[in-house]
Amino acid sequence: VEKIEDGQYVLKFNILFNNGERHLSKYVGNVRQGDEFTKTTLTQDLTMETPGFGYLEYRGPSPMWNIKGVNRWSIRLYTDGIVVHPDQYWGVELNGEGEYITIELFTDSHYTTEIPEGRYVISKEEVPYHANMGQGGWGYNFGTWYYDLGDNQAPAVSGEVNVGRNGDDYTVAFQLIDDRGNTIQSDYTGPLQYWDSYNTSSA
């Protein structure tokens, strides 16, 4: 394998079959890296540009019958310039440049208008002070995901999110690991606009 330029590779094959025949071949062109199980498109560690604004979405109690006393939330952070439509399933206008991240986390059920300060650990467990790992893919993502408008995306499979608060301002600092081992990190300090999608959708 030889890389030439602009993502182009030269792949040379020299295959010996069981019957003694040898097959020689060569391919020149683009090679898509990854496999059917790896969902990140990142190829190296990334520090997200400092977000300029964000939302705190209350999503209500867990819909799982066997999980009680847990509420679901999403912290949604966007860099300046991104246009987002919360009332249209959080659609983002795909023009220009920008980055955003969705962090799904869990609290005790008595939190319905704010989230407590603390350390939230990325995992699959739906319990307070945990954040849901990035799952899904191929058009149906849920959990904690990083995106940019240049078609990059990455699920968080481990890491942590630290939440602090001073008056109306939250501090959200995250250090996440994607499914290729890349680190994704950044932090935000400022207000988070509250959005109650649970009571809106159930009204």
Explain the meaning of each model-derived region.
Residues 25, 35-76:
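Extreme N-terminal export signal peptides that direct proteins to the secretory pathway
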